[in-house]
Curated annotation (Swiss-Prot):
The gene is trpB. This is Tryptophan synthase beta chain. It comes from the Bacteria. It catalyses: (1S,2R)-1-C-(indol-3-yl)glycerol 3-phosphate + L-serine = D-glyceraldehyde 3-phosphate + L-tryptophan + H2O. Its cofactor is pyridoxal 5'-phosphate.
Amino acid sequence: MVSTFSRKDQNYKNDDLNQPSKEGRFGKYGGQYVPETLMPALFELETAASNAWKDKLFVEELNHLLKTYVGRETPLYEAKRLTEHYKTKQATPRIWLKREDLNHTGAHKINNALGQALLAIRMGKKRIIAETGAGQHGVATATVCARFGLKCIIYMGAEDIKRQSLNVFRMKLLGAEVKVVNSGTATLKDATSEAIRDWVSNVETTHYILGSVAGPHPFPKIVRDFHAVIGEETKKQCLESFGSFPDILLACVGGGSNAMGLFHPFVKETSVRLIGVEAAGSGVDTDKHAATITKGSVGILHGSMSLLLQDDNGQVQEAHSISAGLDYPGVGPEHSHLKEIGRAEYGSVTDQEALDALKLVSELEGIIPALETSHAFAWLDKLCPTLEKDTHIVINCSGRGDKDVNTVASSLDI
């Protein structure tokens, strides 16, 4: 589905970009729709995070581990053959990749997992739970738990376990207990629901490392802030590489953490277009897609008000994507807000378009992107023909595709 965004669609004030509010709202989205038993834990987490960012020693430890353990900063790489491929008579899109796939564990997810593990230790919590879809957040969480000697339980849908058997083994090898979720569609939504149930029952001893910019306040802000290192590095690297900020930022969106990490430091730089790409699955006009912003309506899921895929009765519908990490019927509340005020644009691409993009990037650049990331690459087919001048485009290469090889092998005729 091609975006119809134009500059005149922007109708925000500066206050709209200073989010969330004290009540945890991004405009009308966000909030805390949770049982009373969780409210003290959410308040404790909000206070711990606020105090931690003011603590020089905490920030120094986080930055030291991001450098020596995660491997930051990640490179900004110019994809010259991809640039040549998308060159038109009107314009040359210079395409740059923010290489989050080169992080320890192979994706952006460890930025947040590491930060939240340090918060858990600060709060005296020894037991960690997390949900995972593609397995990357599960692997990242299991990794930091191994590093700090924390007990780790990962909830994962049975369907995703079939798709991501390699990551399941990695989590177990790292010492985590992987709990299979068979309820509902047995995918990310259901794994998240089970993790929240666990947290309600064990809130005194347990910290829930939520993996996306979704869930009740303060999670959307906390996850965003730990991932904002992506965009902060990108700002500096763009100035070093070509002397200005990029014209366009491009990222895939499921729950939306990798996109928010890239977008957030640029939100007030209103000359920079922010484009998120959702999973259209078999097509947005079918019932097999995960294009929440494109086709969703306002509702409440997992403690937050946001755009959701739901029927006329408000029942959450099944999402579908070949990518386990995008197979989610909701989206982070800040994305819903940025869409509503016109600051960000969102489109969607199908499973087949993502597969074709994965193959193209692999052949042209020698980089096998994750299926999630491939959705962002696929948007270049729609975006580049519309460009009227030479344009710097930064794509968040959010993860590597090793985990997806079996899925891709059964889908592509190579």
